[in-house]
From Swiss-Prot:
Its job: Involved in the biosynthesis of the chorismate, which leads to the biosynthesis of aromatic amino acids. Catalyzes the reversible NADPH linked reduction of 3-dehydroshikimate (DHSA) to yield shikimate (SA).
EC number(s) recorded for this UniProt protein: 1.1.1.25
Gene from which this protein is expressed: aroE
Catalytic activity: shikimate + NADP(+) = 3-dehydroshikimate + NADPH + H(+)
Protein name per its UniProtKB record: Shikimate dehydrogenase (NADP(+))
Pathway: Metabolic intermediate biosynthesis; chorismate biosynthesis; chorismate from D-erythrose 4-phosphate and phosphoenolpyruvate: step 4/7
Upper taxonomic lineage: Bacteria, Pseudomonadati, Pseudomonadota, Gammaproteobacteria, Aeromonadales
Gene Ontology, cellular component aspect: cytosol
Assembly description: Homodimer.
Length: 273
């Protein structure tokens, strides 16, 4: 039976085995999917050993995505742009192909929730790996403008400069943010620490869409805050998790699983996984 893994540290909380087991059942693919939690300095050795022992593919999560980028034999265009790898496939000719499905998962989930991207004004909070992975897929949807805000403004400026060839992307400090946005995406991990990005409430209006890449059994702090400011459409990152997994499954197996039922099952079981 074909073997797949998710590498991370920590990774015991990962929902990936649950998701991919449901995908396999739905598409009648025979595979097993497990967890690997090597020490940071042992990731390269563990990755090579997994494929040497017959592994077919893996997902890679924090803190190994940048290491994986350097370890694979070949990169997909979207992984090269993202500077990080979250999906690796052993190809038929024995090559380790590195891909990044995070941004595609984000865009798919936004569309599933009816969020219009073409011609929109998007505010992206954060300039780390999650933001980098999202930029190319978001800009491919041709928004009117995409503004990056980050606590360290120089990082936002650098990221905007790297992606300016793909569309109207710019950087702004939190203090100077103003104007109208149709969508705000929080790519920071602030919600995990119970913190909020330093946004002024005036940016929130009834018709704005709010997206937090983090998720939980209850509203994230960012989503709870936005609702309190009058935002009517708020979405957490659970759907993005399922959509990026579906994209990875497609890379590995050549068949695209449906995501709606899997997302429903995941929400139903979130408190026990």
């Amino acid at each position: 039976m074909d073997r797949y893994l998710v590498f991370g540290h920590p990774v015991r909380h990962s929902k990936s085995p649950f998701i991919h087991t449901l995908f396999a059942r739905q598409t009648q693919q025979e595979l097993e999917y497990g967890l690997a939690e090597p020490a940071v300095e042992e990731f390269a050795t563990s990755l090579r050993a997994f494929f040497a022992q017959g592994g077919k593919g893996c997902n890679v999560t924090v803190p190994f995505k940048e290491q994986a980028f350097a370890l694979v034999d070949r990169l997909s265009p979207r992984a090269r742009r993202a500077g990080a790898v979250n999906t690796i496939k052993l190809t038929d000719d024995g090559v380790l192909l590195g891909d990044n499905t995070d941004g595609a998962g984000l865009v798919a989930d936004l569309k599933a929730h009816g969020v219009a991207l073409a011609g929109s004004r998007i505010l992206l909070l954060g300039a780390g790996g999650a933001a980098r992975g999202a930029l190319a897929p978001l800009l491919a949807e041709q928004p009117e403008a995409l503004v990056i805000a980050n606590r360290t403004h120089a990082r936002a400026e650098q990221l905007a400069a790297e992606f300016r060839d793909l569309g109207a992307v710019s950087a702004q400090t939190y203090e100077r943010l103003g104007g109208h946005f149709d969508l705000i995406i929080n790519s920071t991990s602030a919600s995990l620490q119970g913190e909020l990005p330093p946004l002024v409430p005036a940016l929130i209006h009834a018709d704005i869409a709010i997206y937090d890449m983090m998720y939980g059994a209850t509203d994230t702090p960012f989503i709870a805050w936005a609702k309190g400011q009058g935002a009517r459409q708020t979405v957490d990152g659970l759907g993005m998790l399922v959509e990026q997994a579906a994209e990875a499954f497609t890379v590995w197996r050549g068949i695209r699983p449906g995501t709606k039922q899997v997302l429903r099952e995941l929400k139903r079981n979130l408190g026990t996984l």
